[in-house]
Swiss-Prot record:
<dbReference type="Pfam" id="PF02867">
    <property type="entry name" value="Ribonuc_red_lgC"/>
</dbReference>
<feature type="binding site">
    <location>
        <begin position="660"/>
        <end position="664"/>
    </location>
    <ligand>
        <name>substrate</name>
    </ligand>
</feature>
<comment type="subunit">
    <text>Heterotetramer composed of a homodimer of the large subunit (R1) and a homodimer of the small subunit (R2). Larger multisubunit protein complex are also active, composed of (R1)n(R2)n.</text>
</comment>
<feature type="site" description="Interacts with thioredoxin/glutaredoxin">
    <location>
        <position position="833"/>
    </location>
</feature>
<feature type="binding site">
    <location>
        <position position="266"/>
    </location>
    <ligand>
        <name>substrate</name>
    </ligand>
</feature>
<dbReference type="InterPro" id="IPR000788">
    <property type="entry name" value="RNR_lg_C"/>
</dbReference>
<dbReference type="GO" id="GO:0009263">
    <property type="term" value="P:deoxyribonucleotide biosynthetic process"/>
</dbReference>
<feature type="site" description="Important for electron transfer">
    <location>
        <position position="797"/>
    </location>
</feature>
<dbReference type="InterPro" id="IPR013509">
    <property type="entry name" value="RNR_lsu_N"/>
</dbReference>
<feature type="disulfide bond" description="Redox-active">
    <location>
        <begin position="238"/>
        <end position="464"/>
    </location>
</feature>
<feature type="site" description="Interacts with thioredoxin/glutaredoxin">
    <location>
        <position position="830"/>
    </location>
</feature>
<feature type="site" description="Important for hydrogen atom transfer">
    <location>
        <position position="464"/>
    </location>
</feature>
<keyword id="KW-0560">Oxidoreductase</keyword>
<dbReference type="GO" id="GO:0005524">
    <property type="term" value="F:ATP binding"/>
</dbReference>
<feature type="binding site">
    <location>
        <begin position="237"/>
        <end position="238"/>
    </location>
    <ligand>
        <name>substrate</name>
    </ligand>
</feature>
<dbReference type="InterPro" id="IPR008926">
    <property type="entry name" value="RNR_R1-su_N"/>
</dbReference>
<feature type="active site" description="Proton acceptor">
    <location>
        <position position="451"/>
    </location>
</feature>
């Protein structure tokens, strides 16, 4: 696999010599001071001298004080050159290495011993409740020396300060506040979790996976990093729930939501079955509507803790576009309107839109709102069946309805999107017409980030398991080539690894909250590795093992464009995005078919009306798509893969999705997901403080042009991270480095449309509203309408308005040219550390 990071440290920073003994304090001290000297100034820089005299010596003497010195001494220099962020990361990496066990095996035993002591049991060689998983400990007992030999500690030095701090604070295992893992130990633990350790090729598979993850070519979702290889081992990212219109179901969903949030999952819930305000209950009762339920789940999200250093609980509730409580729901987060009792503060909301609603918006027609208990079954329909039933309900005088202007409602929705960033928009017809889960039923909601579309009902909790390919590290900058086969191979490794995670996940089988109600149990059984997962036992295991869903996507797409000098809003970018996504889909499908050849397809593959059994993949749902014409056969051996797919089936019902990748992109120093960079100068929070980052690609290009100086740093700051008004920068450079608010808002829609044929699920698509736009609400409406016309499944995740505070209000920097040094390719000896 030719990922540029898989076998080396970061290009342009590959100044770490081979053979450095990282366990020798004297050698590492010498190395760090040499790295500090890898910057030169026309005048000797007192800040860098202070870095020598204080930071490195503090590292050798006192870890805690060194952390504070690092923040004070290095981070203020980062705006002058991105390499300071890597220097800070390298110093932090060394501090971590001298304060964690010397080998991976020692770390495993240390964790087990510490957890065992907490539980009153001392034996590092045996499994301990709350520690690492039994299979990890057993495998380390047998193969510890081989695993230790795989660890490449130099790779810890390829992370910038933001990335390594995120890993250490949010992912690495601590017991009683003592840190046991450095980044490489995290990656090895995750690689082992993603491997079938009973396989004859286990060590080879661990090595392959470890190389990709530690090389920043493959990034696993947060729950995998948190829990992979531990006894808790919930590695799923997303859970989708469907709530019924009765107190038993509502109570059950509250309990299930609390349970799943505690497992580090993000939650998406369908609220559309709940009857509207004033609807009849029993003989004389009346419903309070969805408002109180929103507030209930809002409090759940605020009250459940996912554990130290992990992300807070988060829930998204979805509502259909014809629900009679539409306006109560719409204003539930707007402080100036609605009933305060029904307010939500952290609960996110999504709207499920039909083609019929969009048609009536376009034609300026009326739209009818109903209570679900008056139109039972309507939410299960889509397409022409929905249109016929909806019109019949409108024509029925016995059914109560509220009539509104479709265009006015759409405008009010867009106003809320501008004001609050929500609701998300999910296009129901596009989702279901191109669903791999048609054989299961109608999809009625998405997940927390609006990229997962899987079937769920009151007796089945949909699950998804995520990864992203760091596509920017498959670019050869010197030749301008992209290693598409390497991307496909990485997607295959992700697919194989996620399948192992699905099999090994701790499904909490005895948890009453995750069981079917007694009168709704069946005798269906799924068997994996000799363990029978009964439908009557657990709703999560049933869904995950029956359908084996995955969501493999990408991060760093804009990094690819910037490396290759391609504007984000160009036709070249749209075509390149499609090729990259095709590579990911090809690699994932190829591996899933290979697994099916060995182990068989996913169990629900054999159910009636399964589109995979009909020989269809996602691109086959698109009208006019021709496999011979539209697949890139010169790059990918699609014909061979499709032949095997038709013969053996596929091991996963869905393999691709496009998640937002916010935290993992930070760890890997990439622009998030498929998005354009938000600014060329931005602030990042680390620990208790913040520091400013300059776009590293822009800085390099300006440095190559001889334009990187103190004046340029100041100009970028004065323009709030934009370079469009800095006329001394060549126009072609300004085109390449337009930010998310400066590119044509249609560009991200076109990127999504380009990659959608190769995404089984959907795309977490944001909109960044341009500055100084005359009518932002109108622009939001146009963006959603364009997404609908281009057949996207997700019309919108977040709508990003203009931040209230300009970024230059924080940490205004004053640099002189002497502060703006250039990296020196060779290391410079320093007499101060030669002793």
């Amino acid at each position: 696999m030719a990922c540029s990071m898989a076998n080396a440290v970061r290009p342009g920073l590959s100044d770490l010599p081979e053979g450095v003994d990282l366990s020798n304090p004297k050698e590492v001290r010498s190395l760090l001071i040499k790295l500090t000297h890898a910057r030169k100034s026309t005048v000797y820089d007192t800040k860098i001298r202070r870095l020598h005299g204080v930071i490195v010596n503090s590292i050798m003497e006192n870890y805690n004080s060194a952390e504070g010195e690092l923040d004070m001494a290095i981070t203020p220099l980062i705006p002058s050159h991105p390499d300071y962020a890597f220097l800070a990361g390298r110093v932090s990496a060394y501090m971590t290495q001298i304060n964690t066990p010397k080998t991976f095996t020692d770390a495993v035993y240390g964790i087990q011993m510490a957890v065992g002591e907490t539980n009153g049991f001392r034996s590092p060689m045996k499994p301990v409740k709350g520690g690492l998983s039994d299979e990890i400990v057993d495998f380390v007992n047998e193969h510890g020396a081989r695993l230790d030999g795989m660890i490449d500690d130099v790779r810890d030095y390829s992370h910038n300060y933001m990335g390594i701090t995120g890993l250490l604070n949010g992912v690495a295992i601590k017991v009683n506040k003592k840190l046991y893992e450095r980044p490489q130990y995290v990656f090895m633990r995750v690689a082992m979790a993603m491997t079938d350790l009973s396989s004859e090729t286990a060590l080879e598979d661990i090595w392959q996976t470890y190389m990709l993850i530690s090389g920043q070519c493959l990034s696993m979702a947060s729950p995998v990093l948190f829990n992979g290889g531990t006894s808790s081992s919930n590695t799923a990212s997303c859970f989708l729930l469907d709530m019924g219109d009765n107190m038993v179901s509502i109570t059950k969903k509250v309990a299930q939501t609390m349970t799943l949030i505690a497992k580090n999952g993000g939650i998406g819930i369908n609220f559309s079955k709940l009857r509207a305000t004033g609807s009849k209950i029993g003989m004389a009762g009346k419903s309070s509507g969805i408002g109180g339920k929103l507030n209930l789940f809002d409090r759940v999200a605020q009250s459940v803790d996912q554990g130290e250093n992990k992300r807070p609980g988060a829930i998204a509730g979805y509502l259909t576009d014809w629900h009679a409580d539409m306006y109560d729901w719409l204003y539930s987060r707007y402080s100036g309107s609605g009933n305060e009792v029904n307010k939500r503060h952290v609960l996110n909301m999504g709207l499920v839109m039909s083609d019929l609603f969009m048609e009536r918006v376009e034609n300026d027609k009326e739209w009818s709102l109903f209570s679900p208990n008056d139109v039972v079954g309507l939410e299960e329909l889509y397409g022409e069946k929905f249109v016929r039933a909806y019109r019949a309900h409108e024509a029925n005088p016995k059914i109560k309805r509220t009539t509104v202007s479709a265009r006015k409602l759409f405008s009010d929705i867009a106003n809320m999107m501008w004001s609050t960033g929500e609701p998300y928009i999910l296009f129901k017809d596009a989702v279901n017409e191109r669903s791999n889960h048609k054989h299961l039923g109608t999809i009625k909601n998405s997940n927390l980030c609006c990229e997962i579309v899987q079937y769920c009902d009151t007796n089945e909790i949909a699950v998804c398991n995520l990864a992203t390919i760091c596509v920017s590290n498959f670019v050869n900058v010197e030749t301008g080539e992209i290693d598409f086969e390497g991307i496909a191979d990485a997607a295959g490794v992700a697919c194989k690894g996620i399948n192992n995670l699905i099999d090994k996940q701790n499904y909490d089988l005895g948890n009453e909250q995750l069981m079917r109600l007694a009168d709704e149990r069946t005798e269906e059984v799924v068997e994996v590795n000799g363990i029978k997962f009964d439908a009557k036992y657990n709703l999560v295991s049933y869904s995950n093992l029956k359908h084996r869903p995955q969501g493999i996507g990408m991060q760093g797409l804009h990094d690819v464009f910037m490396k290759l000098k391609i504007p984000y809003d160009s036709e070249m970018a749209f075509r390149l995005a499609a090729l990259i996504q095709e590579a990911i889909y090809y690699g994932a499908v190829r591996e899933s078919v290979k697994i099916a050849e060995e182990k068989g397809p996913y169990p629900s593959y054999y159910w009636d009306n399964n589109t995979h059994r009909e020989g269809k993949l996602q691109f086959d749902f698109l009208e006019g798509f021709d496999r011979d014409r539209d697949l890139t056969h010169e790059l990918f051996n699609w014909r061979e893969v499709l032949k095997k797919f038709e013969k053996f089936g596929i091991n996963n019902s869905v393999v691709t999705a496009q998640p937002p990748s916010a935290s993992s992109s930070q760890l890997n120093d990439n622009v998030e997901s498929i998005e354009a960079i938000t600014s060329n100068r931005f602030t990042k929070g680390i620990k208790d403080g913040k520091f400013i980052i300059i776009n590293k690609h822009l800085q390099k290009d300006l440095e190559d042009l001889g334009m990187w100086d103190a004046q340029m740093v100041g100009d970028i700051e004065a323009n709030d991270g934009s370079i469009q008004n800095i006329e001394r920068i060549p126009k072609n450079i300004r085109e390449i480095y337009k930010t998310a608010r400066e590119i044509d808002h249609k560009a991200v829609v076109k990127i999504c449309a380009a990659i959608q044929p190769f995404i089984d699920q959907t795309i977490s698509k944001n909109m960044f509203v341009p500055k100084n736009v005359d009518n932002p609400v109108q622009l939001i409406m146009e963006n959603v309408i364009l997404g609908h016309k281009m057949k996207l499944k997700t019309g919108m995740y977040y709508t990003r308005g203009i931040p209230a505070m300009k970024q230059q209000n924080f940490g205004k920097m004053n640099f002189q040219d002497k502060d703006i040094g250039k990296p020196v390719p060779e290391l410079v000896d320093c007499e101060a550390c030669s002793a």
